[in-house]
Amino acid sequence: MITSDSHMHTRFSTDSDADIRDMIESALKKGLQSICITDHIDKDYPFHEDTGVEAFLVDLDEYFPKLAEWKEAYAEKIQIRRGIELGLQPHLAGFYEELTNQYPFDFVIGSVHVVHGMDPYYGEIFEGRSDEEVYKETFLATLENLDAVSSFDVLGHLDYVVRYGKCQARQYSYKKYAQEIDEILKKVIAMGKGIELNTAGWKYGLAFCHPHPEILCRYKELGGEIITVGSDAHKPEHVAYDFQKAAD
């Protein structure tokens, strides 16, 4: 049984309006013993007219006192950790290092949402290109990020890009990108970092979590030891999403 959800978002994230109390109460109803709030900081996020989003930023001077308040209020019921999800881009290495040194995060996820100025979520990166090309570019961009940024604990949803491919996972497998993925996993291990098992893949219609189970197995084969589990919930009903399936 998985009793900790290490990836969830609240109203402090640009893409969520969830109240912290509601997320905590949902976790309690689902029998969790620990949660980590990991709201988004994606500095220099590409602007999109349809959303009006210029950046995913968190007011940390409000965030930390608010989390401390809820941590104390629920101290006898559940452990609440103070986390953050950083959107990795190589040029932000210094900014993130300063940020994580300045604020006492309990846990930091490093995720690749932006690939050479584009978030696969919006689809432009796939225009006139095959899924194969974009997936490979994303894995290579992940390596670029790992070479530049070290201010995180685990690498989030490694194959996030597959959610948004034109064919999603129909032409996707670990074997097809083994060279790039192995380099990512070896780099993560050498850095003393971990990877995340993110159950949101199922929520987005994939037949697997992030990363693909073959990648999780390969990570272990290469000597990887750190795997955290997170739902990537942006709403209370998605806390601990499909955790039973992940446990199986």
Regions picked out by a protein language model, each given a short descriptive name:
Residues 175-240:
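Active-site-adjacent C-terminal substructures of enzyme catalytic domains
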Residues 39-41, 112, 159, 223:
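Short, small-residue-rich loop/turn micro-motifs
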Residues 33-34, 106, 153, 225:
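Short acidic/polar active-site loop segments enriched in Thr and Asp
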